[in-house]
Amino acid sequence: MRVLILGSGVIGTTSAWYLSKAGCEVVVVDRQSGAGLETSYANGGQLSFGYTSPWAAPGVPLKAVRWLFERHAPLSIRPTTDWNQYVWLARMLRHCSAERYAVNKSRMLRLSEYSREALEALSAETGITFEGRRLGTIQLFRTQQQLDGAVRDIELLTQYGIPYEVLSPHQLAKFEPGLADGSVRFVGALRLPHDQTGDCCLFTQRLAALAAKRGVEFRYGCTVQRLEVDGPRVTGAWINGALERADCCVVALGSYSPLLLAPLGLRLPVYPLKGFSLTLPMIDASRAPVSTVLDESYKVAVTRFDERIRVAGMAEVSGYDVSLNPRRRSTLEMVVQDVYPGCGDLGRGEFWTGLRPATPDGTPVIGATPYQGLFLNTGHGTLGWTMSSGSGRYLADLICCRPCEISSEGLDMFRYLVSTIPCPQECAPCVPPTP
């Protein structure tokens, strides 16, 4: 089977890897000069298998109003003329109830835990390295209210058998001694020992190289213009003015996926959630994080790679704008100076922004569509790196009509469709047309 994958970020590349292993002929196209150069380029570096949560959570609507007036708000909204922005925000607000939060988080945890297993197996098989650390992650609470609010998440962690530790300030120093140099005295923390860290871009590029050795063809500098449709089936895509035919197409274009799907009448509720990062050369390892910490107040993570510190986070709903906002840089600098002063060289920091493809409920969109031969792997929001290996392996099983290792409930786009169209997974959409 010939599979055309649109997009070579971490999601498209892991999809290519697993489809190649399943015996498919795989072609990957991307508009950039290499793999992982857009949203996957400089994300937070967290593999947050346990700390997987939707932005749509109880209390967020009231917090969002307060954040409108805060300089260092973790979530900000810049109104645009795009009506889709307001539709997406309204849908997100509907998912902020405790009941919907529990459902959405459980779906995300299911995929994240599967992704952890998939990444461990992939790493063992290939020996791939990506400046990774297996030392857990820590969520830091500045207030008792934040610590008390973690009870809801702890209940779900317990339900899924995910190990965790609630740390006192004294216990916190044992795992992250560098915090002692900071100006903040945290009231407590939640540690997830099975979480990891690593450079997403490095992983993506090295996995692309391994996939290429398996015969996967990567074509860069390619603009995807539209999908080719023949009745109920997608038969390929127009790329740089030429038709590239395939038995199956996978849309892994992140925030740009809805733009490609709209002409087919598919309204995918994925919208850009703009994030920011600052990568610093490390200048004092003793004052740097051991792994990753997340400051809950600002939704900013500080992550250690081999010789670099990555400070990343926040969410700005501002459409497809990729300009660098100096105010966001000041927030990143403020947090790292608060928490780990002197760990990195702020004067030589690389400031970056990326558009994270977010769904209103936080769960990605993976699987079939109403069109035969068209599959999606997008909408992972801030957790694309975390969920990438599991998403790629799960999608390969779907396309190749193999039994999936996790439940497909709530993962495909049909949870959004008010339609009588049956999910074509039931009729093996992966089977190529008869010649």
From Swiss-Prot:
Its EC number is 1.4.99.-. Oxidative deamination of D-amino acids. The keyword Flavoprotein applies. It is an enzyme of class 1 (oxidoreductase). This is D-amino acid dehydrogenase. Keywords: FAD, Flavoprotein, Oxidoreductase. InterPro entries: DadA, FAD-dep_OxRdtase, FAD/NAD-bd_sf. GO terms for molecular function: D-amino-acid dehydrogenase activity. Belongs to the DadA oxidoreductase family. The lineage of its organism: Bacteria, Pseudomonadati, Pseudomonadota, Gammaproteobacteria, Lysobacterales. It comes from the Bacteria. Disulfide bonds: none annotated.
